[in-house]
Amino acid sequence: MFAADGDTVSFEPGMLPRPQDTVLRKQTVSVFASTDLDRRLKTLGVKTVIVAGLMTHACVAGAARDAVPLGYHVVIASDASATRDIVRADGQKVDKDALHRAALAEIEDTFGDVMTTADITRLPLR
């Protein structure tokens, strides 16, 4: 689905990395498992991570779940994350919107906060 150098992994024109940005290429569902992100964040003294992206039920939830035992407070940007319809082995389809809501509910119920981007931008900077 996300093959290196494929069409699905290119940056959107309005979201191209700037020279000062760090781009990490992960090989696992969670960004923490296959990169040095934890070391980088700890070096910077980061205590809270805001997670957004694709797919809510997989990569977003995986990163959030892995961040908590590493000592981070997790906030999910609900309107900056999304997922896709999935078809189970028995042929039953799970709608993307229902899956997105369920993933956010699980995160909020167990290990993180879920907020809109508007609410996140109003958080105090530390």
Describe the predicted segments one by one.
Residues 1-126:
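Active-site-adjacent betaalpha module
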